[in-house]
Amino acid sequence: MQKSILKNKFNAEVIESIKQIKKEIYTPTRFIRMLYQYNNNAVEVVKTLVAKDTTIGIEKLYEKGKLELSIEALIIKPEYKELFPIEIVDICSRKLKKLGYKAI
C-alpha cells in the first residue's frame, strides 16, 4: 500500500480510537493538543510520544481493560509497522506484553 494512503488510514484509526477513549474512559487532552500542533499527523505525534516513553494513556486504558484502544496496539498492527522505526515498534510491543496484551 502506498505510504501516504497508509498514513491516512492510520490517522483515521487513531481518530476513531480517540473518540472511543473519550466516550468510554477519559479525554486524552495532551495527545489531542499534539495532533493539532502536528497538523493531524498522528504518525509524527506517536513517534514523539513513544520516544519520550509516555505511559499515562496506556496505564489508564490498562486499568479499564481497553489496551486494544491504545496507540501502542495500533502501531504493532502488521499493516502499520512500516510507518515506524523498528525501535518504536519494539518499545510498543514490550509495553503491551508487560501489561499482558494478548494480541501480540
Task: Write out the residue ranges for each language-model feature.
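Charged, compositionally biased N-terminal leader segments and the immediate start
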Residues: 2-23, 97-98
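Intrinsically disordered, charged low-complexity linkers and terminal tails
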Residues: 9-13, 31, 40, 48-55, ...
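Amphipathic alpha-helical packing elements
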Residues: 17-66
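Amphipathic alpha-helical binding modules
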Residues: 63-104
